[in-house]
Design a protein with these regions (language model features):
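Basic, alpha-helical terminal appendages of large translation-related enzymes
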Residues: 2-48, 278-281, 290-293, 371-381, ...
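Catalytic alpha/beta core of large soluble enzyme barrels
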Residues: 76, 89, 281-380, 385, ...
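Alpha-helical recognition segments enriched in aromatics with Gly/Pro capping
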Residues: 324-330, 334-347, 376, 494-631
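N-terminal catalytic cores of NTP/NDP-binding nucleotidyl/phosphoryl-transfer enzymes
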Residues: 42-112, 118, 141-156, 179, ...
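Amphipathic alpha-helical
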Residues: 213, 218-242, 278-320, 465-497, ...
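Helix-rich, typically C-terminal accessory recognition domains appended to large enzymatic cores
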Residues: 97, 162-176, 428-459, 514, ...
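Residue patterns forming the tRNA-binding/recognition surfaces of aminoacyl-tRNA synthetases
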Residues: 2-11, 18, 26-27, 31-39, ...
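Conserved oxyanion/phosphate-binding beta-strand-loop segments in alpha/beta enzyme cores
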Residues: 12-54, 84-93, 117-124, 228, ...
Length: 822
């Protein structure tokens, strides 16, 4: 990166020429390599308290890093270095989320085996990440494709299997025709594959599932423990989707079976004039009569070809009458049973009771198919004649509801589940929208699922002592599209012996999703060479859990939810002693190209950091990444903006070079500016207002330059304070300034400075003097001047303009003097 010069030449260059980012950054990279600044103990040997700051580790994409990726890494490093200055030992690791669809799709596109392309991509991105000059501890590095890492990913799965949390199920799943694999609900966005954007369809497949629903209540209630953005907590709460209601049993006319529905409004049961089943409901086909069978079977087939999102979209509802009836358990009325694809088999019971008078969707359906509409809630008890839309107001009194007539609906809503349960018609129930996690993928590039299928013993886990079950090397790794993983074609790997009975058996050929390793990787960083346990209790106690997690909000209901689930499970089995992975979360916004368009190679708007580092230096780019806008919001990139930041660093450098040999004592103005500088940068850093921290440096530097013009130079303590404050943002130049000012050792051993509010106060302030609201003069007065003295001095300043009668004299402290005349 730098110049081939001696240390003596280097020192001479630094002291006598303008800001030279190449020489400075080369010098301090080498110095940090020899003398690391992030130490577990202080100079006296006292152990430092840890602070674990974590980035969401990257997919090793073939496109490398662009300036948008840099933003998150710079934010985390600024925070890490700030905590280092506060005296913490910083746990700040980095690794690679290298299994899964992104890596495999890139390998297929390039015609290279994913093991080769992934290794090449890791090497390139690691080089780019090192250009950031972050505090990453590469001794902690992990890679999800390393067998010594995924041994423990498989170990977690085996533990879940033994605890009954991992199970097999055959059912229609989300299927991406392009990626040729199943997808979890969380990986489908607006009906499209989260990775490639292809329309998602349905495919009936045998799948491995994780029973995340067992943790639904804890995942929801424990959100209150977390110092996370409210937006993310709400997204998770909505995804978990807790609701209170009742399961109600509807007997089927002429049959012994009952259809159980889940409803959050059991108070409206008298108004249920029909019911709708999901086409996949286990009774759907058998409910068809001879007259309806052909139409029912066609409808079931058509529904199976649609994604859940397509089925739930707000468009015209479709349906088919089965020909069968249920009996409303409260009033004994016959209730026609319909099928419609807007009801999903995996929510509730896969069947709903429909109250068209009080639900827009049910009203639309009933109107279309000529089904009776019975109003059971009315405002002031008055029934609506000729309803043209559903009455969906929450408040009202019950009508047409037998013994419930006259009751307030809000009261009955709470009581009805218990009334229904007491009468043996159903059960009071809590329900969740959260579904079990579809965990298997029909791809090659993923962790093999450590299960053996035995004809006699069934599904048997690979013994823990035999882990890792290594992914076999293959020539053909492209997805088959048949619902079988490419591993299914490797007979010598598939065929094995049952670990229990020793008879011939077959290995599971599906692999784990890309989320498997990322759900727990943050634990492995701190004990990544331990081959005996996932993480030792000693290391866990010393460095876990994560104090600050920084990454994009796009993972709110994927990685962040899965990580919480994994952490709670590992806590339950005693592997760790905490049940939430990340104390604090910060979501940075995206850096976009022109007109707010997401950066991508296909759009040709990717900005590589490499050239900017070469031309302006790492420090300038780091500061500009923060300066582009509030870190939590998206920001549009403009290369021209880096000039302003670079200009600030040059002006600061020149100020230091002009002052470092001057024998200047701190004036009141210097001391005041020093304390204001500390206050502004500290408060802005603490509030994560990093863009205003950068502008704060510029503002205060300009003020110091003005003071230097008057006093000849700036005192060393003020400039040293500037270096310490700047060190998290621009570490190279901060180190160099610190050394140029005569300090020994690293600036990162200095400790974060404090401020004194008294020292920040002005001795004198300028106050405008107004007559009838118009400014006539500006005077300098003591900051603590009394009202009487301020008005007296103000009147003196405008004495020649006081030509009328004074009716009022106003002094707003430190703001304004106003004399009202007539």
């Amino acid at each position: 990166m730098g110049l081939n010069i001696s240390k003596e030449q280097e020192e001479r260059i630094m002291s006598n020429v303008p800001y030279n980012h190449k020489a400075i950054e080369k010098k301090w990279r080498e110095r940090w390599e020899q003398n690391p600044v992030n130490l577990k103990a202080d100079e006296k040997g006292n152990k430092r308290e840890k602070y674990y700051c974590l980035d969401m580790f990257p997919y090793p994409s073939g496109n490398g890093l662009h300036v948008g990726h840099w933003r998150g890494y710079v934010i985390s490093d600024v925070w890490s270095r700030y905590k280092l200055q506060q005296g913490y030992y910083i746990v700040h690791p980095m690794g690679w989320d290298a299994f899964g669809l992104p890596a495999e799709n890139y390998a297929i596109k390039m015609g290279v085996h994913p093991a080769i392309s992934t290794a090449e991509n890791v090497k390139n991105i690691k080089r780019q990440i090192n250009e950031i000059a972050a505090l990453y501890d590469w001794d902690m590095e992990v890679n999800t494709t390393d067998p010594e890492f995924y041994k423990w990913t498989q170990w977690i799965f085996v533990k879940m299997f033994k605890e009954g949390l991992a199970y097999e199920k055959e059912f229609p799943i989300n299927w991406c025709p392009s990626c040729k694999t199943g997808l979890a609900n969380e990986e489908v966005v607006n009906g499209k594959c989260e990775r490639c954007g292809t329309e998602v369809t349905k495919k009936n497949l045998r799948q491995w599932m994780l029973r995340i629903t067992k943790y639904a209540e804890r995942l929801l209630s424990d959100l209150d423990k977390l110092d996370w953005p409210e937006k993310v907590k709400k997204m998770q709460a909505d995804w978990i989707g807790k609701s209170y209601g009742a399961e109600v049993d509807f007997p089927i006319e002429g049959r012994e079976e009952k259809i159980t529905v889940y409803t959050t409004r059991p108070d409206t049961l008298y108004g249920a004039t029909f019911m709708v089943l999901a086409p996949e409901h286990e009774l759907s086909k058998s409910l068809a009569t001879d007259e309806t069978r052909e139409a029912v079977e066609k409808y079931i087939y058509d529904a199976s070809m649609k994604s859940n999102v397509d089925r739930m979209q707000d468009k015209e509802k479709t349906g088919v009458f089965t020909g069968s009836y249920a009996i409303n358990p409260l009033n004994g009325e016959k209730t026609p049973i319909w099928l419609s694809d807007y009801v999903l088999a995996d929510y509730g019971t896969g069947a709903i009771m429909c109250v068209p008078a009080h639900d827009d969707r049910d009203f639309e359906f009933a109107t279309k198919f000529g089904i009776p509409i019975v109003q059971v809630i009315a405002k002031d008890g008055k029934e609506i004649e000729n309803m043209t839309e559903a009455y969906t107001e929450a408040a009202g009194n019950m009508i047409n509801s037998g013994e419930w007539n006259g009751m307030e609906s809000a009261v009955l809503k709470k009581e009805a589940p218990h009334i229904i349960e007491k009468r043996g018609l159903g059960r009071a129930t809590v329900n969740y929208k959260l579904r079990d996690w579809v965990f298997s993928r029909q791809r090659y590039w993923g962790e093999p699922i450590p299960i053996v299928h035995c004809p006699d013993c069934g599904a048997v886990p690979v013994p823990e002592e035999e882990l890792p079950l290594r992914l076999p090397e293959v020539e053909s790794y492209e997805p088959t599209g048949t619902g079988e993983s490419p591993l299914a074609g490797i007979d010598e790997w598939v065929n094995c012996k049952c670990p229990v009975c020793g008879k011939p058996a077959k290995r599971e050929t599906n692999t784990m999703p890309q989320w498997a390793g990322s759900s727990w990787y943050f634990l492995r960083y701190v004990d990544n060479h331990n081959d005996k346990e996932l993480v030792s209790r000693e290391k866990a106690d010393e460095m876990l859990p994560v104090d600050m997690y920084i990454g994009g909000v796009e993972h709110a209901v994927l990685h962040l939810l899965y990580s919480r689930f994994y952490t709670k499970f590992l806590y339950d089995i005693g592997a760790i002693d905490f049940d939430e992975p990340f104390h604090k979360l910060f979501n940075q916004g995206m850096i976009t190209g022109k007109n707010g368009i997401k950066m991508s190679k296909s759009k040709g708007n990717v900005v590589s950091p490499d050239d900017l580092v070469r031309d302006y230096g790492c420090d300038s780019l780091r500061m500009y990444e923060l300066f582009v806008g509030p870190p939590e919001l998206d920001a549009e990139w403009d290369d021209r903006g880096i000039d302003g930041v670079n200009r600030f660093l040059k002006r600061l450098w020149n100020l230091v070079m002009d002052s470092k040999d001057a024998d200047v004592k701190a004036t009141k103005d210097m001391i005041k500016e020093r304390h204001r500088l500390v206050y502004d940068i500290t408060t802005r850093l603490e509030s994560f207002s990093l863009n205003t921290a950068i502008s704060g440096f510029m503002e205060h530097n300009n003020k110091l330059i003005e003071i230097a013009k008057k006093e000849g130079a700036i005192d060393k303590e003020t400039l040293s304070t500037m270096a310490v404050l700047l060190s998290p943002f621009a570490p190279h130049i901060a180190e160099e300034i610190w050394e140029q000012l005569g300090h020994e050792g690293s600036v990162f051993a200095a400790g974060w400075p404090t401020y004194d509010m008294e020292a920040m106060k002005d001795d004198e302030i300028e106050v405008p003097v107004q007559i009838n609201g118009k400014t006539r003069a500006v005077i300098s007065v003591a900051a603590d001047i009394s009202k009487e003295d301020a008005i007296a001095e103000g009147k003196e300043a405008v004495a020649d303009k006081l030509t009328g009668t004074i009716v009022k004299e106003i002094y707003v402290p430190k703001k304004i003097i106003n004399i009202v005349m007539k």
